[in-house]
């Protein structure tokens, strides 16, 4: 938690400083520096994104208690895109054009980021994106603060294949059906092939956002694991994580039997 708070604190200072330099006298005339908080507080992603909102607000309070940035207090402007991807774009436009925030801290899923991207490019805004992503994108208006697959997913799989990690020979690539899981799993499949893992030892499964019934999928995982030491790489997002792990428990699948590495809890 401390590292995350310090990280957001440093990003907030950078965003405010850049914005003040860029906007000149109009920024100095304001009593506060506005920053946008664009995280889902309702819908399927709220279980993940609400905590990011809370940490951002806590950090802003800490910065303000120490005098703010360049003598000005940070003023958070909070909106709820409600796990609705087009609404992310609408709320981003509102924050930049109407609320005049100097930067936005927001999004979780890559689909929400890609929805916001055209808006921040058009209005020359700044988006600080807080979590891992699939790579294959680089925009000057976005700070990608999370890990790409070569920094997170591949090292995790390498560990699972090692003796210390359990020497997994078979892999279930399980994710929510959108760009980040599919791209990450494409990269992982190629990596596994390079390590001699055959297609018949890789099982790739996807569910929609908000999916709640994992009985069949967990039964498939249990059956698949009978063919050799198996690990699950989960890119399930949002509140679907809850029924997935509950079903693992119901099926009697323990981490010692089938370990699960998750990137989007």
Regions found by a protein language model. Give the residues of each.
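Beta-alpha junction/loop-to-helix N-cap segments that form part of ligand/metal-binding clefts
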Residues: 47-54, 67-136, 145, 207-214
């Amino acid at each position: 938690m401390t590292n995350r708070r310090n990280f957001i604190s440093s990003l907030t200072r950078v965003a405010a400083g850049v914005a003040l330099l860029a906007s000149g006298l109009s920024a100095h005339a304001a009593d506060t520096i506005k920053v946008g908080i664009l995280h889902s507080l309702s819908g399927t992603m709220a279980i993940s994104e609400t905590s990011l909102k809370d940490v951002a607000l806590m950090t802003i309070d800490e910065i303000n208690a120490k005098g703010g940035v360049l003598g000005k207090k940070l003023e958070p402007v909070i909106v709820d895109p409600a796990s609705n991807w087009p609404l992310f774009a609408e709320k981003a436009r509102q924050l930049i054009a109407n609320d005049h925030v100097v930067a936005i801290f927001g999004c979780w899923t890559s689909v929400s980021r890609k929805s916001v991207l055209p808006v921040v490019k058009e209005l020359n805004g700044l988006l600080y994106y807080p979590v891992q992503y699939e790579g294959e994108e680089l925009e000057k208006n976005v700070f990608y603060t999370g890990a790409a697959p070569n920094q997170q997913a591949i090292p995790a799989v390498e560990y699972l294949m090692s003796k210390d990690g359990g020497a997994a020979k078979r892999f279930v690539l399980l994710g929510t059906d959108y760009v980040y899981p599919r791209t990450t799993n494409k990269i992982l499949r190629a990596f596994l092939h390079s390590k001699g893992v055959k297609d018949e030892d890789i099982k790739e499964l996807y569910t929609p956002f908000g999916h709640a019934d994992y009985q069949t999928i967990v039964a498939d995982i249990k059956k698949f694991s009978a063919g050799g030491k198996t690990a699950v790489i989960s890119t399930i997002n949002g509140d679907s994580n809850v029924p997935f792990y509950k079903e693992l428990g119901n099926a009697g699948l323990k981490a010692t039997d089938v370990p699960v590495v998750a990137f989007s809890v």
